[in-house]
Amino acid sequence: MNYVIRSVRADEWAAAKALRLEALQDPVAPLAYLETYEEALGRPDSFWQERTTSGAAGADGAQTVIAEAPDGQWVGMVTVLIEEPGTTDWAGFPVERKQGHVVGVFVRPEERGSGLTDVLFDAALEWAWAHGAERVRLIVHEDNGRAQRFYRKAGFEPSGVVVPLAKAPGQSELEFVLERP
């Protein structure tokens, strides 16, 4: 099937919300996302509007890329954030280089293994490189082997940075990085 790979538009917040809620109900969601379905469901529409606008086409600090089926249905998404040197990231670590940070990766189960995730990642990486990122990173749960295998196949390597999970004592996430080609 042919999909349109594109940046989300600011007015598509309801579709972005629906796909995120679907992602948070996936069986691997506890390993893939810090946010729970219940937390996301309780957020007001204004949250989803702002979140979508901040990652929409034309935004400088973030970009959400979607895969849209011919019938208009969204079947996958990925967001990349730009982190500037001299700032602190979400986990409290200093950001030393301009970098992209991939978050919110989701492809519907029936599309997994089809190559769609590769295409979404290519678009996200292209955007990050075009916005001056020196490297792109992502954080993956230590027990999420499937995701780790995909990220390695995409060229990402473990950096050695381990992030303890505050919500799950005794569990950690691992940073994977891809240097700019």
Question: Which residues fall in each region the model found?
Answer:
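Acetyl-CoA-dependent GNAT
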Residues: 18, 22-110, 121-123, 127, ...
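Short, low-complexity, intrinsically disordered N-terminal peptides in bacterial proteins
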Residues: 1-4, 181
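Conserved glycine-rich acetyl-CoA-binding loop
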Residues: 104, 108-122, 130-131, 142-149, ...
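A short beta-loop-alpha structural element at the N-terminal edge
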Residues: 4-18, 30
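Residue-level preference for beta-strand/loop junctions
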Residues: 59, 98-99, 132, 170-172
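Structured loop/turn residues at secondary-structure junctions
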Residues: 8-11, 70, 143
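C-terminal "cap" of GNAT-fold acetyltransferases
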Residues: 134-137, 141-148, 152-181
